[in-house]
Amino acid sequence: MASKRHVGLNIRKKDEPKAAPIRVSSVFGDDDDDDNVPATATNMASASVIRVQKAAEREHQKAEAEDPTIFDYDGNYDEIQAIKNEKKEEARKADKNRESKYAENIIKAHARRQLEQFSREERQQLREREKEGDEFDDKEVFVTGAYRKQQEEVKKHREQEAEEAAFNDMTSVQKQKLWEIGMGRTLLNDLARDPTAIKQRKKEQKNVRKREDSDEEIDPKPEKSDKKPAEKLKKSIYSDDSDEEKAPKPPQKNFEGDLKPGLNTVSKKKATTHAERIRQRNYTPTPPSSDDEGARAPRARRRTSSPSPTSRKSIESRESGSRRSPEGKSEKSEKAPKISLKDKLKPKKIDKEARLDGLKEILKQRNTEEDIEAARQRYFERKEQGIVVPPL
């Protein structure tokens, strides 16, 4: 039979919770209340917590053994409060006047500002009277004692201000002559220096560095051939050529000299010193005459930069020497006396007179009267132009 349908609003009833099934108690079960309490993390005390509690208990027992009334706070409260009250009374007695920290300075600053204001008002009144002229000369003038006192205070304040201004003016850095002398010297040096000369000097230093780098020893490298090495072709998986057909190339050595049995150590080249670089720069050996001189000349030009004046002189001297006849060389070699090694090792005799002459030459005055006068004239010209400010 079909269920009856109600016409209208059908409200669905909520599902009631099912009642838990009643468990039948066991015959051998215990009905203690402690069995139903769930075991939580708070009930389970760890070993570390127990250890801390035991240590605290031991400390309490020691303290009670020394003083039985140590934890009797209610009994000792009156004594503690009495000690606090005594300290407060001592502080009050020490500060009878109850002087404040900042009030005195604030009052002084306020009085100073008032005096400054009175001084400004007085100046303004004087300017107004000057404008009025003789308009109110026939009127009586009344001056009270308070106004006179105020005028005296304003006068003292003005004197104090003048003293402070004079002291600050004397101790200011701008008025110190030593500072001005130092500043004037640096200013003169900066003006005397020509900026173009400084730039030129920097360029010369750069050129010298480049020349030193270019004149360093260049290792003879093999000529680069235009032919590129044949690229290795990847072996195809379909090729029938065996690996044995292609003989492996021996490894190429990466150092100079012949291979020897054992460990072939490569000797590191020592870094050239500054003196050696100068020697290399000044020394240019004459190449032997050969057919390929024309081919080597452009390479040498590329490697070496513009020759220095010292190197040019050395080249000219060598060329002039090479032009001379071999007979002259033989004559010179015959005339030159041979010096033995003992004579070379003997200490040289010092000529005191020659040494004194050299010292006098070094220490003699180089500025003539004309140079000093010219420098003096230049200084006066700069002074007239306003470049040099004389120290006052």
UniProtKB/Swiss-Prot annotation:
Name residues in a coiled coil: 76-132
Q: Per the record's keyword annotation, is Nucleus included, yes or no?
A: yes
Keywords, in A-Z order: Coiled coil, Cytoplasm, Nucleus
What is any one GO biological process for this UniProt entry? nematode larval development
Select a single GO molecular function from the record's annotations and give it: mRNA binding
Tissues expressing this chain: Expressed in the intestine, nervous system and head neurons in both larvae and adults. Expressed in the distal tip cell.
Q: Name one Pfam family in it.
A: NSRP1_N
Where it sits in the cell: the answer is: Cytoplasm; Nucleus
Chain spans, region Disordered: 1-73, 113-169, 187-357
**Knockout consequences:** Early larval arrest, continued gonad expansion and shortened lifespan. RNAi-mediated knockdown results in continuous distal tip cell migration past the midline during adulthood. In a rnf-5(tm794) mutant background, increased severity of the distal tip cell migration defects.
This entry carries the following GO cellular component terms, namely: cytoplasm; nucleus
Q: Which InterPro entries match?
A: Nsrp1 (IPR042816), NSRP1_N (IPR018612)
Q: Give the Basic and acidic residues compositional bias ranges.
A: 54-65, 113-132, 149-160, 205-238, 313-357
Top-rank lineage group of the source organism: Eukaryota
Signal peptide boundaries:
none
Q: Which family does it belong to?
A: Belongs to the NSRP1 family.
Q: What does this protein do?
A: Required for the cessation of distal tip cell migration at the end of larval morphogenesis.
Q: What is this protein called?
A: Nuclear speckle splicing regulatory protein 1 homolog
The species this protein belongs to is Caenorhabditis elegans
Lineage, top ranks = Eukaryota, Metazoa, Ecdysozoa, Nematoda, Chromadorea
What gene name does this entry carry? Answer: ccdc-55
